[in-house]
């Protein structure tokens, strides 16, 4: 599979340089309202499964694995912090059941062209658990040849051998959670990972045939400055990733308890 490079024009940058919700899922979060209950969702699935949609397009599926061994203070994701890896087994059983419930409505063998595994930390799962998870999808769906099969990777919990397992399972795209390379920023958000560790993993990923590498970055974190973040950007661009996902940190400690561990006085000014 190859990923086509697209030119981003100045006009496009100007057009979309406005505040707005993150377009990270479909339907977007604001579509989920009380009026859209499980019955309505089931009817939508039935319409696809019974031929109500002529020539349905391939599916794009996101799978969430919420487990992490340690807490990143900036995180607003759905997560479970634990070092007890046995907690993953019942979650995976329920996830398999969820897949079965969906295929009962839409039918077995629907084509998936995009499968993304996010979290949480996907590498919290053992190699066998990852194999089991992928077997569920291969049994219930048809994974399109040349599809995009992506997994989020925490550089602190993966090594070159683990990347080999991910390649063996059919993943062709990796997303590395970097956020910032500055040691002071990493300490402030409780996510310490040396830049050299990420560099080595990116090199190992390319050697194992991964076709697309993404790096996640966050601006607005505590102890960041324009100068320090410029250094991070220089290090990231030197890696020549295929994609950079750059997010603004949203400091909402009243909603997300972990963010209360971040000292407000250490947040950079928006000016």
Regions found by a protein language model. Give the residues of each.
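Flexible, acidic/Gly-rich N-terminal and inter-domain linker regions that tether
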Residues: 1-60
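Generic hydrophobic-segment detector
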Residues: 10-17, 32, 66, 108-110, ...
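Short, compositionally biased low-complexity segments
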Residues: 13-17, 70-71, 249-253
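A broad, low-specificity signal for short, low-complexity segments enriched in glycine/proline
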Residues: 17-24, 76-80, 206
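A short secondary-structure junction motif
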Residues: 28-31, 71, 80-81
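C-terminal scaffold of the Radical SAM
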Residues: 51, 55-58, 81-105, 110-271
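Local cysteine-cluster metal-coordination motifs and their immediate loop/turn environment
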Residues: 63-79
